[in-house]
C-alpha cells in the first residue's frame, strides 16, 4: 500500500487517561483538521492493539505515526514499529499528543499537555532523534524482546501499570486501583 508523503497515521487510544481526557479526541481531531493536516486515524480496541496498529501503519508506508495517548500507548507504538517489516524504521517519525495520565515522556521533552502545542510541533517537523533500547526476557512461555524509549521499568512497575488498565476505575482515581494492584501476586 502506498501512502501519500506527509500523511500521518494517527492512533487514538480511548482507554488512556481520565474520562475528561478521553473526551478530548474530538477537539484534537478538529484542531488537526483546522490546520490542514492530512491523516488517517485508527482507534485502538484494547490491550495490545496500539502495538498491532502501529505495526500495520509502518508496514503500509506511513512515515509519521502519531499516538494520541500516554506513555503506555507510546511504548506499544514503538514496539509495533520496531517489530514491523517496514524498511528504514529509523526514518519513521513517531509523534505524541499527550492524552494519558502520566505523560512522563512528553514532560521529559518539555512538551506541555496542551494538545495544540503537540500538533503544532509535529506539523513544524520538530524532531529529535532518540535512542530506542531493547530488553530480552523470558515470559515463562517463550523468549521475548521489548523496545523502549529512553527509560525502562522492571519488576513491580510494569505489572502495577498494567493492572489498573484492566480494572474498572473507582472515582476516576487510579491511585486506589494501583494500591490494590500492588497486593496481587506477580
What do these predicted regions represent?
Residues 50, 72-77, 104, 130:
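Short glycine/serine/threonine-rich phosphate/pyrophosphate-binding segments
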Residues 1-68, 79:
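ATP/NTP phosphate-donor binding region
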Residues 58-59, 76, 83, 186:
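Alpha-helix boundary/capping detector
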Residues 35, 83-186:
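Catalytic core of DAGKc-family lipid kinases
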Residues 16, 74, 101:
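Short, glycine/acidic-enriched loop or turn micro-motifs at the edges of active sites
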Residues 45-48, 69-72, 100, 155:
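Short beta->alpha linker loops
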Amino acid at each position: 500500500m502506498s501512502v501519500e508523503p506527509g500523511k500521518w497515521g494517527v492512533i487514538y487510544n480511548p482507554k488512556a487517561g481520565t474520562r475528561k481526557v478521553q473526551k478530548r479526541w474530538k477537539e484534537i481531531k478538529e484542531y488537526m483538521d483546522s490546520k490542514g493536516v492530512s491523516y488517517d486515524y485508527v482507534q485502538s480496541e484494547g490491550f495490545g492493539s496500539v502495538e498491532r496498529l502501529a505495526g500495520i501503519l509502518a508496514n503500509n508506508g506511513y512515515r509519521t505515526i502519531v499516538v494520541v495517548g500516554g506513555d503506555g500507548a507510546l511504548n506499544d507504538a514503538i514496539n509495533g514499529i520496531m517489530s514491523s517489516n517496514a524498511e528504514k524504521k529509523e526514518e519513521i517519525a513517531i509523534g505524541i499528543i499527550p492524552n494519558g495520565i502520566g505523560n512522563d515522556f512528553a514532560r521529559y521533552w518539555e512538551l506541555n499537555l496542551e494538545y495544540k502545542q503537540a500538533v503544532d510541533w509535529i506539523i513544524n517537523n520538530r524532531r529529535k532523534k532518540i535512542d530506542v533500547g531493547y530488553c530480552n526476557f523470558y515470559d515463562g512461555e517463550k523468549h521475548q524482546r521489548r523496545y523502549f524509549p529512553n527509560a525502562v521499568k522492571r519488576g513491580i512497575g510494569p505489572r502495577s501499570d498494567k493492572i489498573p488498565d484492566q480494572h474498572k476505575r473507582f472515582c476516576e482515581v487510579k491511585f486506589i486501583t494501583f494500591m490494590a494492584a500492588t497486593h496481587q501476586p506477580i
